[in-house]
Amino acid sequence: VSATANDGVAVSANNQTYIYLVKPLAAVPDSKKGDVRTLCFVEVNDENILNCGEYVMKESGKPFFDVVSIFAANINVDSESGRVHIHCNDQVSFLLKNADKFIRPLQAKGIKVNMSILGNHDEAGMGNLSQAAAADFAKELKAFVDIYGLDGIDFDDEYTVYKENPSPGFEQRSRENYCRLISECRKVMPDKLLGIYEYKSNFEDSPSGTVDGKSIGELVDYMCYGTYQRYVKGRESNFTGLPKSKYGPYSLKINEEYKGGWTSFKEETIQDLKDAGYGLQVFYNPKPQL
């Protein structure tokens, strides 16, 4: 028995007849609040993503968070076949198997739910896939998104073991290779969200360049600077064609702020971000009691 994904429906390949159980969904409310999109990464080993649905705007009652990203599934390589694939730990697998309980309630409020893809201590990474491997992995990501009813993918190029002498199917790490992966994802997921988390001073963990006439700034929906509690303006210029409206220069860990562990949460900084034309504010790991 094998499963295939077709337009978001999982079917068994050995069946001769299919019975589809259709569950009607209510219209998704409009959660748009302004020009700044809010994104929250949730480390699901520690926190419940449903916490994000409890944060609402005081006056309108709309959800505070526009996008919630499950952190994280992994990119890994099969040691026998050499094929790159998605790996989920027990916590992520539990969420996906119980999507009606954990994911759909957020989506019903108008919140987009993405999956973060993170390196996992082997050679598989965003910056070293060959053309064929990038296209193949993009198709697997699409099937994954369709089967579990997700709204997009966020990429975080950490923890990959890049090699000076790449194995078959891999190339030397480059920002252009990373851009090619995003291009392949955009081809098969034209209507899904694609985001990038970056933080290194040399920018090697982020894509840049142009593929088939499209710059990385055109291919992604947003990128964010992931060094928490630091506000750095101007980094967007290091990503080909990326406008300020798609960049988040300031990420905040909500729990530390709530406990008084940081002093950098300032209203004037958030206001300056908006006034400067940036279009993304990033948060991490909200607690339920706020």
Model-based region annotation:
Residues 1-290:
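Secreted glycan hydrolases and related glycan-binding modules that recognize and/or cleave
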